[in-house]
Amino acid sequence: GRVSYEKNIKAFLEMETPGTKVVCGVGPLEEALKSRYPGVRWLGLLPRDELALVYAAADVFVFPGRSETFGLVMLEAMACGTPVAAYPVDGPLEVLNASEGAKGGVLHADLKQAFTDALQVPRWQARERAMDFSWAEAGKLFQAYLVPARSSS
């Protein structure tokens, strides 16, 4: 990921939580944040296979962004069985399917509360929600819209 202002990573770093905080990625705020938060494990930019191992080893993936239009990293984490904690804003609302009870993670205006609650989300549920975004599911959705369009012309 990108360690930059718009990712709101400070919200994650300032949370008091059990365990070790891990940050993957590089960016303009990286050096300043490294010196301010020395207890955080900074892994830099990782190859996809290593990143998948980091996702799978995490108890919760914290997505502190408030301005993402989608947030593919949430799906990547959930595909590895890691529940997501996020603010209830556009990207996470769609990815976690807020209209059906936020499957695969927890949305909350208090990010620490989202984190705490996400610890209780079963890992299989996170993975199952990620599979809703597979190419096979995308194809089904596309076909569902094609048929009504053909019959109305």
Regions found by a protein language model. Give the residues of each.
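A conserved mid-protein helix/loop that constitutes part of the nucleotide-sugar donor-binding site
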Residues: R2-E16, P28-A32
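Short alpha-helical donor nucleotide-sugar binding micro-motif in glycosyltransferases
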Residues: L53-A58, F142
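Nucleotide-activated donor-binding/catalytic signature segment of Leloir-type glycosyltransferases, i.e.
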Residues: E30-D49
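A charged, aromatic-enriched C-terminal amphipathic alpha-helix characteristic of glycosyltransferases
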Residues: L119-P148
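Short hydrophobic beta-strand element within catalytic cores of glycosyltransferases
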Residues: P83-A86, N97
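Short glycine/serine-rich donor-binding loops of glycosyltransferases
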Residues: L13, G71-M74, P92
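Aromatic "clamp/platform" in nucleotide-sugar-dependent glycosyltransferases that forms part
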Residues: R66
